[in-house]
């Protein structure tokens, strides 16, 4: 499994601009991804699924409580203790860059 640990990345979205923390763990051989959002977004929940590993890249899908029934897509490429990626919101035809991602703990 790749990318295990606690990561921070910068995002610039309509509802929030700043850093978010992402914890990637191994749960019985499956990726368990937990988003630790700032207090401003404390009621927002994110569910991930269909996570696929390809080399040093993770791709997956998700849903967010603010957009019920709307699927999101993400792709993140790891390079040591850093990563870059994108979050796609297909129904809005929008792509959000995940910038300056870096590991803060294993």
Language-model features and meaning:
Residues 1-78, 86-106:
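Central antiparallel beta-sheet cores of small beta-barrel/beta-sandwich binding domains
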């Amino acid at each position: 499994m790749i990318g295990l640990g606690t990561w921070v990345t910068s995002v610039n979205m309509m509802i929030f601009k700043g850093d978010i923390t992402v914890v990637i763990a191994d749960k019985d051989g499956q990726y368990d991804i937990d988003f630790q959002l700032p207090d401003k977004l404390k009621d927002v929940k994110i569910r991930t699924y269909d996570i696929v590993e390809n080399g040093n890249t993770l791709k997956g899908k998700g849903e967010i409580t603010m957009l019920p029934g709307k699927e999101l897509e993400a792709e993140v490429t790891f390079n040591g203790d850093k990563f870059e990626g994108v979050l796609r919101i297909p129904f809005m035809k929008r792509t959000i860059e995940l910038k300056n991602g870096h590991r803060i703990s294993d």
